[in-house]
């Protein structure tokens, strides 16, 4: 299984990251498009996660940017999928009890906004033969627990975003 995300000069394009023109509460909200190839036979659903581990020195924890589950298996996910789908999506890190702005986005895609230097965002897609059936919205730990014993294949790509 392979993931393809088009980069611009080696970085996630600005329209999906820090310099996006479409934002909510200062955060980019238009999710990036991607293509999947070589899905294993029997794949019916595609959950994924987008996590920034380079945020640990900045805020003390890995920043969750996007969780999606029970997406019917397709080879192409269009731009802005997060805001235009009824697919179950989990909490991103704006739900943190350390963030107090009620206007911030709490579920779905929140684009990269590296504050200190370029960051690599770990985008992992899983191929499943059955749904995760998570109660929406859900947390990353619940997402990971639900994956156990259900993964046919998985693939990861690191998406650099510029400061």
Where are the predicted features?
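N-terminus-centered regions that define maturation/targeting leaders and the start
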Residues: 1-163
């Amino acid at each position: 299984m392979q993931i393809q995300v088009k980069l611009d000069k080696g970085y996630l394009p600005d329209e999906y990251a820090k310099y996006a023109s479409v934002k909510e509460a200062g955060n980019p909200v238009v999710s990036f498009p991607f293509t999947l190839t070589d899905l294993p036979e029997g794949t019916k659903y595609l959950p994924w996660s987008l996590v920034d581990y380079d945020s640990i020195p900045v805020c003390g924890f890995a920043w969750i940017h996007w969780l999606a589950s029970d997406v019917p298996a397709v080879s192409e996910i269009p731009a802005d999928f997060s805001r235009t789908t009824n697919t179950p999506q989990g909490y991103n890190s704006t739900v943190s009890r350390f963030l107090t702005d009620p206007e911030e986005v709490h579920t779905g895609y929140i684009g990269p906004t590296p504050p200190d230097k370029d960051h690599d965002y770990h985008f992992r897609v899983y191929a499943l033969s059955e749904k995760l059936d998570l109660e929406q919205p859900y947390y990353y730990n619940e997402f990971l627990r639900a994956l156990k014993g259900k993964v046919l294949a998985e693939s990861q790509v690191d998406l650099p975003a510029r400061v």
